[in-house]
C-alpha cells in the first residue's frame, strides 16, 4: 500500500540525551536503546471514517519519537498497518450501501492527506491487512500445529481461536486482572460467549466465511483474519521480534496489544514481542472521550476545510502530555494559533539572542518521556525574549526555526 509523501527534515547541530519513554508493561519510564536502526510499529486506522483528533494525537506522538531518533542519527524503520478488512468497515459499507473496498480506499486516501497536512513523517512500510493475509495464514497454521490454536466444533462456521494460555507470560503487557480483561475483551471486539470456545478469552485468529463477507482460501477453509493477528504478522515480517517500540492509543492496551504480543511470542518462542509498549491518552470533547459511538468526533479534514492551519492543530494536540487524557476545546485551538504566530514572528527576526540553550532544553524535554508542555514553554520563552529584547546573533532565528521544524514538525518559515 502506498504511504504519503515525506517532508524534508532540517538537520540541527548537536544532539540531545537518549530518549526515555513510559513502558506500559513495566509501568515505568525507562531508556529506549535502539541500535543503528530504530524500529517501531504503530497500529493504524480501520478506514471506515475520517481521521479524528484522537487518531491524530496518537500519530503525532509517534512522529515525535521518529523525529527524536532521526535527530540522534538513527535510521528509522517505521511500520504502520491499515485494518482494511474488519467488521466496522463492512458494517459502515452496508449501512451506506457502498462497496467496502471503495469505502476503505477513500478513507485511507483521506487519512494520508491528513497525515501529510499535519507533517507526520510517513512509515517506511504501510501495509494493509488484505496484503498480509498469506502471512496470517502461515501463523495460524503454526498455531494449530503446535496446539496454540484450535478449530471450534461448528460445522457451519469453523472459526479458529488462539488459546489465551498459549504463552506463560500472557497478561504482562497490560498488567490487568482477569475481571478487567473480561470486561475489556467483551467491550472491545471480543466474543466471550461464542459457543465452542474453550476459554472466554480465547481470541479469534481466523474467521470462517460468512454470507456477504469477503473471504480467502486457507487450509482451515475460506475466511478472513482476526484483528489482533494482523498486526502480529505484519510486524514480524517487517521488523521481526524484539523491535524497539509498539505504539497506539490506550484503548489498544487490551485486548489488541496483549494478543498481538501473545500471538507473536507463541509463533517465535520469544519472551517479549516489543521492547517498549507505549500508549497515548484519549482526546475528549466537552468532558467526554471522542468516539464514533458518541458522535462527538472532530475531524482533521473538517478543520482543514474550515481553513484551520494544520500547524495549529498539531500544536494544540502537542500542548498536553501524550499519556494524559485531555480535552480539545476552542480555547486549545485559539492558544495554539497564538503560539504559532508568536514563534513565526520570532523566527522572522533578523537577529536575536542565542538559541543554543533553548534548543538543548527542547531536546532534553522531548527526551524525557516526550514532555511537550515543558518543551513548548521553553520555546515560548525564547520567542518572547527575542521579540522583546532582540539580540545580536544573526543565526539564532534560523536555528530556532530549524529545531522547531525538525523536532516538532512545525514549519515557521516558507520553504
From Swiss-Prot:
Molecular function terms from GO: ATP binding; cysteine-glucosaminylinositol ligase activity; cysteine-tRNA ligase activity; zinc ion binding
EC number: 6.3.1.13
Reaction(s) catalysed by this chain's protein: 1D-myo-inositol 2-amino-2-deoxy-alpha-D-glucopyranoside + L-cysteine + ATP = 1D-myo-inositol 2-(L-cysteinylamino)-2-deoxy-alpha-D-glucopyranoside + AMP + diphosphate + H(+)
GO biological process: cysteinyl-tRNA aminoacylation; mycothiol biosynthetic process
Region (Disordered): 1-20
Keyword set, alphabetical order: ATP-binding, Ligase, Metal-binding, Nucleotide-binding, Zinc
Residue ranges of the motif 'HIGH' region: 45-55
Residues that coordinate or bind Zn(2+): 43, 231, 256
Binding of L-cysteinyl-5'-AMP, residues: 43-46, 58, 81-83, 227, 249-251, 283
Function: Catalyzes the ATP-dependent condensation of GlcN-Ins and L-cysteine to form L-Cys-GlcN-Ins.
Subunit structure: Monomer.
Protein family according to the UniProt entry: Belongs to the class-I aminoacyl-tRNA synthetase family. MshC subfamily.
Protein name (Swiss-Prot/TrEMBL): L-cysteine:1D-myo-inositol 2-amino-2-deoxy-alpha-D-glucopyranoside ligase
Amino acid at each position: 500500500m502506498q504511504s504519503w509523501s515525506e517532508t524534508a527534515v532540517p538537520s540541527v547541530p548537536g544532539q540531545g540525551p537518549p530518549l526515555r519513554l513510559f513502558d506500559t508493561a513495566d509501568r515505568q519510564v525507562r531508556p529506549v536503546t535502539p541500535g543503528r536502526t530504530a524500529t517501531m510499529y504503530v497500529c493504524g486506522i480501520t478506514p471506515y471514517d475520517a481521521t479524528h483528533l484522537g487518531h491524530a494525537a496518537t500519530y503525532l506522538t509517534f512522529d515525535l519519537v521518529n523525529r527524536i531518533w532521526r535527530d540522534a542519527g538513527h535510521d528509522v524503520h517505521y511500520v504502520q498497518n491499515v485494518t482494511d478488512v474488519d467488521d466496522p468497515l463492512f458494517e459502515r459499507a452496508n449501512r451506506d450501501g457502498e462497496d467496502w473496498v471503495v469505502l476503505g480506499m477513500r478513507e485511507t486516501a483521506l487519512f494520508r492527506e491528513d497525515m501529510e497536512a499535519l507533517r507526520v513523517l510517513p512509515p517506511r512500510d504501510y501495509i494493509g491487512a488484505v496484503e498480509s493475509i498469506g502471512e496470517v495464514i502461515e501463523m495460524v497454521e503454526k498455531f494449530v500445529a503446535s496446539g496454540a490454536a484450535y478449530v471450534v466444533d461448528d460445522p457451519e462456521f469453523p472459526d479458529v481461536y488462539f488459546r489465551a494460555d498459549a504463552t506463560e507470560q500472557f497478561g504482562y503487557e497490560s498488567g490487568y486482572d482477569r475481571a478487567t480483561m473480561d470486561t475489556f475483551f467483551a467491550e472491545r471486539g471480543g466474543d466471550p460467549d461464542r459457543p465452542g470456545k474453550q476459554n472466554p478469552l480465547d481470541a479469534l485468529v481466523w474467521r470462517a466465511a460468512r454470507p456477504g463477507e469477503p473471504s480467502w482460501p486457507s487450509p482451515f477453509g475460506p475466511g478472513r483474519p482476526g484483528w489482533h493477528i494482523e498486526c502480529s504478522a505484519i510486524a514480524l515480517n517487517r521488523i521481526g521480534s524484539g523491535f524497539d517500540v509498539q505504539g497506539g492509543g490506550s484503548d489498544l492496551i487490551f485486548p489488541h496489544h496483549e494478543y498481538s504480543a501473545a500471538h507473536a511470542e507463541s509463533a517465535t518462542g520469544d519472551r517479549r514481542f516489543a521492547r517498549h509498549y507505549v500508549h497515548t491518552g484519549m482526546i475528549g470533547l466537552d468532558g467526554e472521550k471522542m468516539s464514533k459511538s458518541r458522535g462527538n468526533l472532530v475531524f482533521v479534514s473538517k478543520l482543514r476545510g474550515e481553513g484551520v492551519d494544520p500547524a495549529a492543530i498539531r500544536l494544540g494536540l502537542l500542548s498536553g502530555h501524550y499519556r494524559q487524557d485531555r480535552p480539545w476545546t476552542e480555547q486549545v485551538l485559539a492558544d495554539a494559533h497564538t503560539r504559532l504566530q508568536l514563534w513565526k514572528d520570532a523566527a522572522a527576526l533578523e537577529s536575536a539572542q542565542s538559541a543554543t540553550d533553548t534548543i538543548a532544553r527542547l531536546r532534553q524535554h522531548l527526551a524525557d518521556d516526550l514532555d511537550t508542555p515543558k518543551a513548548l514553554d521553553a520555546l515560548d520563552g525564547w520567542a518572547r525574549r527575542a521579540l522583546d529584547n532582540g539580540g545580536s546573533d544573526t543565526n539564532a532565528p534560523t536555528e530556532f526555526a530549524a529545531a522547531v521544524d525538525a523536532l516538532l514538525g512545525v514549519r515557521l518559515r516558507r520553504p
